[in-house]
Amino acid sequence: MTSLDEPSQDWPACTLSYRHFHLLWTLPVCGVLLVIARPFLTKLDRAKLILLPIIAFVWTTPWDNLIVRNRAWSYHRHCIWFTIGYVPIEEYFYFIIQSLISTLWCTLITRWTLPNLYLTPSTPARRPLAPFAVATCVVCFVLGLQASVPATHTYYFGMISWWSSMPLALLLWGSIDFVRNMGVGAGFIPFAISVLGPTLYLWSSDIYALRRGTWHINQATSLNIFPIPDLPIEEMLFFLVTNVILVSACFTFDRCVAICRLSAPDHQPPLSPSYLPLGSLATYTKLWAAFVRSDRSSLPTSCASASVEPQDLSASLQVLRAASKSFNAASLLLPWDLRTDLGCLYAFCRVADDLVDDHAQELQAKAKNLDVVRDIVDAVYADSIVDRKQHLSTPIGERLRILLASAALSDKIKQDTRAAATSIAPLTQYIPKRLWYEMLQGYSADLRFQHQDARQRTRLQSMDDLVEYSQCVAGVVGEMCIRVILGRCGSTVPLDLEVDRKIALRASKTIEQSINVKPLDLNRTADVHTLLYEARRMGVSLQLVNIARDVVPDSVELRRCYLPADMFDKEEDDGMYEALLKGRVALPRHASKLVHGAEEQGVVRPQDVRKYALRLLEISQRLYDESYPSLRQIPNRPARAGLKAACSVYAAIGKRIQAQTEDEISSGRRARMSNLDRILRAISAVYFDV
């Protein structure tokens, strides 16, 4: 431990010790950021939070000791605890805490973007920025070395210049063109906010500490330029460049992992925010190979992930944004790799549903569209239409373009369908084709509500029939989502593992108690089956909420009734089931037509149907309460956060149905949640698990 110089008369008196400075300024904000970010931290984020502080500590320690040794800054003895070398122990903590603050802040700012959308090779006409950035850093390095002469006014400035230029040259070479490819909204603005947020905060804390004598900048080794009162330009530069280094490192990590995810062989789990084994040497070799890869290089076309072009991913996710604002908002809480996968999965489900259930088309046209969707699934899985070898040699996008060329669809629908179908191609290694066929059975059931042959019409007679239908259109989606999440986390579920489709309400809290007491071991097939089974139950639960909300609109607009016939009270409401199937609901806007048409006898009121919707909600709530604890078993914290928020927000629609006013009930309006209610429900689910 080295003794410190005695303070001169020019130093301000120390009224704030270094450790109290940490307690007042750095630790609280670090703690707050950690609490906010913790539910969303991926394995990639954790890698940043581990590696970047370590690298910063190793790189800064000798430089900082040299700075203090040459008296560029100094400390009062009684304001520090002790020194290691020439530097107070609190200063070493500062290296780590600042790295954590900046990395956490950058994570919160940039987590909303999808880096895999911006890996398109740069065109020759677009000059790369990396050589210019590296050349600038080299010049700063040379000038900094020349200026860093001890006991001169340029010393501190020069030391910062050469010390920061080396890591900046390396990191900007690996990230600056990637940031430019992301554009202004997704790249430069988040980059700037990520840098300026911590920088402005640390400038403020530095002024506070300097005014209270926590540390002192030597005027003999400073330029003595103060752009902000009491804050030397060297201190401003130090915090600015260190945050640029940290943010550049974060963007570089994102770029490297995005490349690794898209270029991994199909038989290996790709590196991603959800799968990043830091204990494996192969991880670092793959990251380095991605780092040195030129932005002008194309990704290998042999990989299923790389066969999906970024513009198709973008178009698919745009379909999701237009089709389901609720799911799109909830998906923002997922890590970007799972947001891509599950977003594309849901987008294809919506595209397929729109194709099959287009209200403007006749039944025969809808049936043909159902066959088109089935052919699309076959093409994605390379099983039919043409020889398998030809399938594998033809890009999936081209295959689908040929398939859709003869379909009687508009160009816009063809484009959206091809983009959505192309984007699910990487998921074929996790999702068995039979699950898509199961979903198509549900779509077929929707079509048969209006079948000309009465014997083939869809009629849900019992609760078992309703559960079977809900399994096809929602339970299967729950299983798909869990299969994708587990696969992306490195625990691929066998494609031949079939899940029990029978839904049974159990004794209160039985499932919650069993899951809480005995965590699932996802290396055991039986426990994987349990998780998939509960995912299906959750899907059925949410589908029942959807049915309860839309009883009247489904009847009036689609001539459908998803409430099972045996749910209706035979004595009180005989004929209500058939009335709903025929759309004979007395709504204010067209009730007079029904009366004057002499059909008043068979007309039902929304108030009369409501009790059956509430009964369905009771069943849905029990299923939800039993299956919700299973979400805690998902081996991915941010995936848990996103799915809990999505399920909680959707299930809360049931509460909104129960709280509808008499006017809303009689008018047959759908129950809707405000954006504020959605946000509050999501926060409660993510942070308080309720």
Swiss-Prot record:
Chain segments annotated as transmembrane: 21-41, 48-68, 92-114, 129-149, 156-176, 183-203, 231-251
Gene3D superfamilies: Farnesyl Diphosphate Synthase
GO CC annotation: membrane
Keywords from the UniProt entry: Carotenoid biosynthesis, Isomerase, Membrane, Multifunctional enzyme, Transferase, Transmembrane, Transmembrane helix
GO biological process assignments: carotenoid biosynthetic process
Catalytic activity of the protein: all-trans-lycopene = gamma-carotene; gamma-carotene = all-trans-beta-carotene; 2 (2E,6E,10E)-geranylgeranyl diphosphate = 15-cis-phytoene + 2 diphosphate
EC number: 5.5.1.19, 2.5.1.32
Region (Phytoene synthase): 262-686
Domain of life per record: Eukaryota
Region (Lycopene beta-cyclase): 1-255
Subcellular locations according to the entry: Membrane
Topological relation to the membrane, as annotated: Multi-pass membrane protein
Pfam families linked to this entry: SQS_PSY
Associated pathway: Carotenoid biosynthesis; beta-carotene biosynthesis; Carotenoid biosynthesis; phytoene biosynthesis; all-trans-phytoene from geranylgeranyl diphosphate: step 1/1
One Gene Ontology term of the molecular function aspect: intramolecular lyase activity
S-S bonds: none
Family the UniProt entry places it in: In the N-terminal section; belongs to the lycopene beta-cyclase family.
NCBIfam families documented for this protein: CarR_dom_SF (TIGR03462)
The protein's role, per its UniProt record: Bifunctional enzyme that catalyzes the reactions from geranylgeranyl diphosphate to phytoene (phytoene synthase) and lycopene to beta-carotene via the intermediate gamma-carotene (lycopene cyclase).
Protein name: Bifunctional lycopene cyclase/phytoene synthase
